[in-house]
């Protein structure tokens, strides 16, 4: 009981002392320390002993605090120091965060300044180039070109790199201008204006006009501070002395005018130094470039710079990246080969067109023969009689009688009827205009061309001779009639054979023309090759030429035999004229074929040359 009572008393005393001193324990002010707070693992006596030890410690601290006179002030000071320490730590953290933010802000600000400076430099660069181009086009009052191309980056770099030299130049220029003004004022105090008007009365008007023109066409940035007179003496500009004397008088009267004049002169001095530096870089390059002011207003900075780079000449000092001579040679060779190839293809197409026109004209000159059914029947009868083609002649040769033997009256009547029908058909052909244009046989005995009247007269004479021959009994008249009839029939047979051979040749030629027209139509197609197309045609033409030559040789041999037989009968025979006509016609056909073959060969040669050029061009590329 005593121990429990003593422990409770001690507990109360310690709690009262702690509350009185304001000491904050582990459980906070006003919160009593219970045995449960010590932990559930301790036994009751262990908890009591631990609590007792803590209480003794608190009592000792309270006794020590109570002994000090200013214990509350000390506690408050300690608390204040602790709070200050905590605040200082927070401030350090805040300072660190603020330093990071400040650095980021400074970096952003620097980046913005750099971006702004780059944009301004680009604007100034483009504006300076525009002004220089406009000044070059206008000639700056004299209509003359500058001696060299402006280097746009030169003055900017000089101004940015060497500012003290620029200041010294300004000071030197100002001092020179002042000394010049003083000298001019001493030399020409009053008589400057009348001397100027007397010396050159027309010069001020021209200078005024040029000054106005330049001021109107110049950009607005330079229009404000630009003075009318020019300081340069060379390059087609007027003298300085009269204007300077006038300006000196004005400057004496008005100090503002003097200040403006000094600024303008300084600017012109800067321009002169910049121009002198640019002239040293490259001399002798005179070039006019179209102005970019109107074009560059609605474009971005990159577009303006690209346009200026494209329009700038190759020999200027700005364009340092020169093309190598090997690449220039290859480009020239490529352009040369390309031009030659284009010319070759143009010539090829022109030759194709000419060949087609030539063939069309050749085909139009020989139209088709309109064969009638009566004519075909008459030709069949003539072939049956044995005087048409060489085959008919071969079949009729064994049936023909010798020249000296007499013939039967039935055979003579049949031959006479056949000759009459042949004459009628022949006269019908002569009446046809197309046939008259192509075939015009002549007779040697009468030396007259064939006409309807002549044909009728011959027919009547033959009929009269035949009628008198049947009535006569004397052998002389019979032999004469037989000889004349035989000659006439032979002539008619030769004519009919020649006409049949001509018609056959014409039919063959028409077939060839049709094939050639088809080939020409196929030639116009780009994928068809001309060699493959012409090989078959050339082979066919060669075969046909061989056949025609063989047939001509056979017909000439048969005609030679007939001529020999006819010469035995009579010295005069009209078969020679028909043979001459056949020879002429065949010769014309051969000439035309030779021309076509020659044109084909030339065309092939041209194609081979064009292919070679194309291969060389492809190898070069």
Swiss-Prot record:
Name of the featured protein: CEP295 N-terminal-like protein
Residue spans of biased composition, Basic residues class: 159-170
Segments of this protein annotated with the region Disordered: 142-253, 385-421, 491-529, 543-586
Domain of life of the organism encoding this protein: Eukaryota
Keyword Coiled coil attributed: yes
Gene designation per UniProt: CEP295NL
Alphabetical UniProt keywords: Cell projection, Cilium, Coiled coil
Coiled coil residues, start to end: 328-359, 498-525
Biased composition (Polar residues): 203-213, 568-578
Cellular component, GO annotation: centriole; centrosome; cilium; cytosol
Record's subcellular location: Cell projection, Cilium
């Amino acid at each position: 009981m005593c121990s429990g009572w003593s422990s409770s008393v001690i507990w109360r005393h310690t709690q009262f002392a702690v509350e009185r001193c304001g000491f904050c324990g582990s459980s906070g002010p006003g919160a009593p320390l219970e045995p449960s707070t010590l932990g559930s693992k301790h036994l009751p006596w262990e908890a009591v002993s631990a609590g007792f030890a803590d209480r003794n410690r608190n009592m000792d601290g309270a006794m020590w605090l109570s002994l000090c006179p200013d214990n509350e002030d000390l506690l408050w000071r300690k608390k204040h120091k602790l709070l200050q320490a905590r605040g200082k730590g927070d401030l350090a953290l805040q300072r660190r965060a603020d330093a990071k933010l400040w650095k980021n802000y400074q970096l952003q600000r620097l980046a913005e300044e750099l971006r702004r400076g780059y944009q301004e430099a680009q604007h100034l660069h483009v504006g300076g180039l525009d002004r220089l181009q406009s000044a070059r086009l206008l000639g700056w009052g004299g209509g003359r070109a500058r001696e060299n191309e402006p280097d746009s980056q030169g003055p900017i770099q000089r101004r940015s790199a060497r500012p003290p030299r620029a200041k010294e130049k300004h000071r030197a220029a100002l001092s020179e201008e002042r000394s010049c003004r003083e000298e001019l004022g001493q030399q020409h105090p009053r008589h400057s204006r009348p001397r100027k008007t007397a010396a050159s009365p027309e010069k001020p008007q021209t200078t005024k006009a040029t000054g106005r023109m330049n001021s109107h066409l110049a950009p607005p940035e330079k229009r404000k501070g630009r003075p009318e007179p020019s300081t340069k003496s060379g390059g087609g500009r007027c003298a300085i002395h009269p204007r300077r004397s006038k300006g000196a008088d004005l400057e004496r009267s008005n100090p503002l005018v003097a200040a403006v004049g000094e600024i303008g002169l300084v600017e012109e001095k800067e321009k002169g130094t910049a121009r002198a530096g640019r002239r040293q870089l490259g001399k002798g390059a005179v070039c006019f470039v179209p102005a970019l002011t109107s074009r560059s207003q609605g474009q971005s900075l990159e577009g303006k710079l690209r346009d200026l780079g494209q329009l700038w000449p190759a020999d200027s000092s700005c364009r340092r990246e020169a093309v190598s001579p090997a690449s220039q040679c290859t480009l020239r060779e490529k352009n040369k080969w390309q031009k030659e190839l284009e010319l070759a293809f143009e010539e090829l197409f022109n030759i194709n067109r000419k060949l087609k026109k030539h063939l069309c004209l050749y085909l139009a000159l020989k139209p088709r023969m309109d064969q009638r059914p009566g004519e075909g029947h008459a030709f069949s009868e003539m072939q049956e009689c044995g005087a048409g083609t060489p085959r008919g002649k071969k079949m009729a040769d064994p049936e023909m009688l010798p020249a000296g033997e007499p013939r039967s009256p039935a055979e003579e009547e049949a031959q006479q009827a056949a000759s009459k029908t042949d004459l009628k058909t022949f006269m019908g052909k002569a009446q046809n205009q197309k046939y008259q244009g192509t075939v015009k046989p002549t007779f040697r005995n009468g030396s007259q061309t064939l006409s309807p009247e002549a044909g009728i007269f011959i027919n009547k004479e033959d009929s009269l001779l035949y009628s008198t021959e049947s009535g006569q009994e004397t052998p002389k008249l019979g032999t004469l009639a037989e000889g004349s009839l035989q000659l006439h029939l032979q002539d008619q047979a030769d004519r009919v054979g020649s006409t049949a051979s001509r018609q056959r040749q014409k039919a063959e030629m028409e077939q060839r023309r049709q094939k050639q027209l088809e080939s020409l139509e196929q030639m116009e197609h780009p994928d068809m090759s001309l060699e493959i197309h012409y090989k078959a045609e050339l082979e066919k033409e060669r075969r046909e030429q061989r056949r025609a030559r063989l047939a001509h040789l056979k017909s000439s041999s048969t005609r030679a035999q007939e001529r020999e037989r006819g010469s035995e009968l009579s010295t005069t025979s009209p078969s020679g004229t028909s043979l001459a006509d056949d020879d002429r016609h065949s010769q014309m056909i051969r000439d035309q074929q030779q021309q076509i073959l020659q044109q084909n060969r030339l065309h092939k040669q041209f194609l081979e040359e064009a292919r070679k050029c194309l291969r060389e061009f492809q190898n070069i590329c």
